[in-house]
Structure formats: structure tokens, C-alpha cells
């Protein structure tokens, strides 16, 4: 019977459900396609965001407010993108234990999810791929380490 709960490692799980490995997707941010980088920067600063990476001269800024990250990108893509960075925490600092983007790619493929774009190089290090959710929202898995 699946209606009974059993505590496991401080979490509640169904008693008879087979669990699978939870993917470690890394740092989450939303990458916003903006029309005017300076105006967008000024707007987000008014609501508490601060620049912590990127360069206006390169057409992008990464901004942070507490544990929330946003990227402002002018002229780089058409739609907003949900972005995950394996190997980074929410402060864009390297973490020791993470699922490599190549492993995540195989897990995603094994679930029957279509890969929209794939840019994998070598057996480790920076690489990326993207998928599209059922509503057409792009999701980028982008490893920098």
C-alpha cells in the first residue's frame, strides 16, 4: 500500500516506491533576454539585486539577491532560459561533489527527453546541453568547471 509514509534520512518517502538518484543540477538562475542592458540593470538594482559577474561591454551581467541569481543578456538569445550550472553552488563557487554534465545528459536521455542542443567536449570539464519543456521554455544545463 503506497499511502503509508516511512522516514528515511530525515525525509518522508513512500514505503514501497523504488527511489532513483536525484540529479544534482547545480546553481539555478534565470537568463533573461533583455532589450537594454543598462535599463534592466538599473531596474533590478532598485529591487535589491547586485552585479557579481559579467561585463556590460560583453553584453551580459549576472546579478544576485540573497540566494537568487539572474543573468541579463542583451542580443545573445531570443527567449528567457532556465539555467542550471553543475559544479557550482548559488554563489557560483565550485563544489566538490556534483553530477557532471555528461552524466546528467545520459540521465535525461534515459528518461526519453529530447535534447534540443548538445555541446559536449571531452570526458570532463566545461560542456552544455539544452532541452525544451512541454510549454516551449528552454532549459540550459551549462557546466563551467
Where are each of the predicted segments found?
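N-terminal beta-strand motif that seeds the catalytic metal site of vicinal oxygen chelate
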Residues: 11-41, 144-145
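Core segments of cupin and vicinal oxygen chelate
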Residues: 24, 31-76
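Vicinal oxygen chelate
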Residues: 35-38, 76-77, 85-135
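Residue-level structural signal for beta-strand termini and adjacent loop
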Residues: 57, 75, 121, 142-144
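Conserved beta-strand in the GNAT
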Residues: 70-73, 130, 139-140
Amino acid at each position: 500500500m503506497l499511502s503509508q509514509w516511512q522516514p528515511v534520512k530525515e525525509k518522508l518517502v513512500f514505503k514501497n516506491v523504488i527511489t532513483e538518484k536525484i540529479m544534482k543540477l547545480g546553481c539555478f538562475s534565470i537568463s533573461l533576454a533583455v532589450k537594454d542592458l543598462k535599463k534592466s540593470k538599473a531596474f533590478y538594482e532598485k529591487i535589491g539585486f547586485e552585479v557579481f559577474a559579467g561585463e556590460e561591454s560583453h553584453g551580459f551581467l549576472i546579478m544576485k539577491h540573497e540566494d537568487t541569481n539572474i543573468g541579463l543578456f542583451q542580443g545573445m538569445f531570443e527567449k528567457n532560459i532556465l539555467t542550471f550550472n553543475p559544479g557550482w553552488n548559488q554563489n557560483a563557487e565550485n563544489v566538490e561533489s556534483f553530477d557532471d554534465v555528461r552524466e546528467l545528459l545520459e540521465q535525461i536521455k534515459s528518461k526519453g527527453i529530447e535534447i534540443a542542443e548538445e555541446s559536449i567536449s571531452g570526458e570532463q570539464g566545461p560542456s552544455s546541453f539544452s532541452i525544451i519543456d512541454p510549454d516551449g521554455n528552454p532549459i540550459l544545463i551549462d557546466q563551467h568547471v
